[in-house]
């Protein structure tokens, strides 16, 4: 399959890319800083882009079989990348005719010390 991956510079996203390449898939990663993405492979294409700026990756979506999102967020601005970024990815998918989207996250596995205790407890119970 021809895959496009968002969030490839994080731990979860990088593992997604590694496993996809091991399975023989062609993988395109969209990253803000391509020079910081050190993984290399014959079936890997690294493209500069930002999920908050859809024009930077819209063309790259063409011809892909599926999109995978392992987007992570900072605790200072926790929803913008997930909500606006994923909406931008989905819009680019619609325009390119890509019908499969897989979203995964490590959210809930690590809690910042500044998160209120009650919030941490509720999340632990749910997850």
Q: Which residues does each predicted region cover?
A:
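Residues at the starts of beta-strands that form the adenosine-phosphate
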Residues: 2, 26-28, 99-100
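N-terminal Rossmann NAD(P)H-binding glycine-rich loop of SDR-like oxidoreductase domains
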Residues: 3-25
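SDR active-site strand-loop-helix element
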Residues: 6, 30, 68-71, 101-106
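N-terminal Rossmann-fold cofactor-binding loop
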Residues: 30-35, 50-51
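Conserved Rossmann-fold cofactor-binding substructure of NAD(P)-dependent oxidoreductases
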Residues: 42-66
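NAD(P)-cofactor binding segment of oxidoreductase domains
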Residues: 74-103
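Conserved catalytic-site region of short-chain dehydrogenase/reductase
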Residues: 108-113
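Catalytic helix-loop patch of NAD(P)-dependent Rossmann-fold dehydrogenases
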Residues: 118-127
């Amino acid at each position: 399959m021809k895959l496009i991956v968002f969030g490839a510079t994080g731990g979860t996203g990088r593992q997604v890319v590694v496993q996809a390449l091991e399975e023989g898939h062609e993988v395109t990663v969209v990253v803000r800083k391509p020079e910081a993405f050190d993984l290399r492979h014959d079936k890997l294409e690294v493209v500069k882009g930002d999920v908050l700026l859809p024009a930077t990756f819209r063309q790259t979506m063409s011809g892909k079989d599926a999109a995978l999102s392992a987007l992570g967020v900072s605790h200072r601005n926790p929803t913008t990348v997930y909500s606006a970024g994923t909406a931008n990815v989905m819009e680019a998918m619609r325009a390119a005719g890509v019908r499969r989207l897989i979203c995964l996250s490590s959210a809930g596995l690590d809690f910042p010390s500044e998160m209120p205790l009650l919030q941490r407890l509720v999340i632990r119970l749910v997850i």
